[in-house]
């Protein structure tokens, strides 16, 4: 089962587990950087899951664009946010200078290292000049299927190399 299949199958329990998690402290530095660049920033919530972070972005005065690859998560996020959610995979993304910011909280953890390189190029392409990108990954050396989903962890050196490319 690939990660999208996993989230389609377990959308409701995953939603219930994550929808009320507070992300304010994690999001604060991103919000501060984004506020310096644009008052009404448009932010892509990449791998939006429940839509929780889209709602928080909008509380900060930004325009959140939720996106997820899982059809079932998109349905739940649409109900939660009362917004249309873009259902597409990273491969399907084709944005040019559209977003002031991209928020990818724990959504890139299911990509192989090669996929991550390709996605990073697409994310840079999607950002406007001086755009702000936030992404989080797991630190470690795990690479493979765990609990029904693929995970690739990173160490500092791997992340630096990825960012230099």
What is the predicted role of each segment?
Residues 1-97, 111-118, 122, 132-165:
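Class I (Rossmann-like) S-adenosyl-L-methionine-dependent methyltransferase catalytic domain
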Residues 100:
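Conserved acidic residues
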Residues 103-104:
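A conserved beta-strand element that flanks and buttresses the S-adenosyl-L-methionine
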Residues 107:
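Hydrophobic adenine-recognition pocket in adenosine-nucleotide-binding enzymes
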């Amino acid at each position: 089962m690939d990660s999208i299949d996993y989230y389609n199958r377990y959308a409701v329990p995953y939603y219930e587990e994550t929808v009320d998690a507070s992300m304010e402290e994690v999001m604060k530095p991103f919000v501060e950087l984004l506020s310096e660049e644009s008052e009404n920033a448009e932010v892509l919530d990449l791998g939006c899951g429940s839509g929780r972070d889209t709602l928080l972005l909008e509380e900060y005065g930004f325009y959140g664009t939720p996106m997820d690859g899982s059809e079932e998560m998109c349905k739940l996020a649409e109900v939660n946010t009362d917004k249309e959610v873009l259902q597409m995979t990273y491969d399907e993304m084709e944005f040019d200078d559209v977003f002031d910011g991209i928020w990818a909280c724990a959504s890139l953890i299911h990509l192989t290292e090669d996929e991550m390189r390709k996605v990073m190029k697409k994310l840079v392409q999607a950002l406007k000049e001086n755009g702000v990108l936030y992404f989080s990954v797991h630190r470690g050396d795990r690479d493979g299927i765990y609990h029904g989903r693929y995970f690739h962890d990173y160490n500092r050196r791997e992340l630096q190399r990825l960012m230099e490319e």
